[in-house]
Amino acid sequence: MNSQQCVIIAIAGASASGKSLIAKTIFDELRRDLGTDQIGVINEDAYYRDQSHLSMDERVLTNYDHPKALDHQLLCTHLQLLKSGEAVDIPCYSYTEHTRTAETLTMTPKKVIILEGILLLTDPKLRALMDASVFMDTPLDICFLRRLTRDVAERGRTMESVISQYKKTVRPMFLQFIEPSKQYADIIVPRGGKNRIATDILKTRIQHLLAK
C-alpha cells in the first residue's frame, strides 16, 4: 500500500443507531495491529456549519438533520488532503452553543480513517472517497430512546426540546434523506453496534484493502 494512501470507511445511520460504538470497537481492535497513530475517527458532526454570526435563538431553529446544515465540501477537502499525505485541522463543534468553537483538532495522515455520521451517504462526492460503507439499520424507536437519554445526560438538553426536535426534524429527515441513503451502503448492519459478526466482516474488509 502506498504510504500516502489511506482506507476510508464510512459508518452511517440514524442518530443513536450504534455508529459510535462500532467505530470505537474497530478503532480499538485495529490500533493494536496498526498503531494508534495509523488509525483515526472523524465525526461528521464536526462539520456542522459555523453559526457564530447567528443569535442563539436562530441557532436553535437550524434543522441539523438536513444535509445543508453540514459543510460536506470541507470534509471532502480534508479527506483528499489526508489521502495525499497532508495534515488537516478538523473543526470542533459545541452542542450547547450550536456552533463551532475557536479550537480545531489536528489530524495527521492515517492508514485507516473511520467516518461516522447520519448523512454521510447522502453526498455523492463523499461516497466517491469511501473505500467501504456501512449503514446501521437500528429500529427508529430504539434510536429515539437512546438519543433522548444521551442528549439530556450529555448535551445539556431538556426532555421537551429533544422530543420536539425529534418530531419536527429528526424523524422527517430520517425518512427523507437518511433511510434512502441505505441503498449506497456496502454493508447493512442490524441490531446496532454490538453486532459482532458485522464488526468482524468490516475489519476483514479493512485488512483486505490495506493488503492491496
UniProtKB/Swiss-Prot annotation:
Reaction equation(s) it catalyzes: uridine + ATP = UMP + ADP + H(+); cytidine + ATP = CMP + ADP + H(+)
InterPro entries: P-loop_NTPase, PRK/URK, Uridine_kinase, Uridine_kinase-like
Keywords: ATP-binding, Cytoplasm, Kinase, Nucleotide-binding, Transferase
Entry EC number(s): 2.7.1.48
Disulfide bonds: none
One function term, GO molecular function aspect: uridine kinase activity
Stated family: Belongs to the uridine kinase family.
Name of the protein described by the UniProt record: Uridine kinase
Organism: Shewanella baltica (strain OS155 / ATCC BAA-1091)
Gene that produces this protein: udk
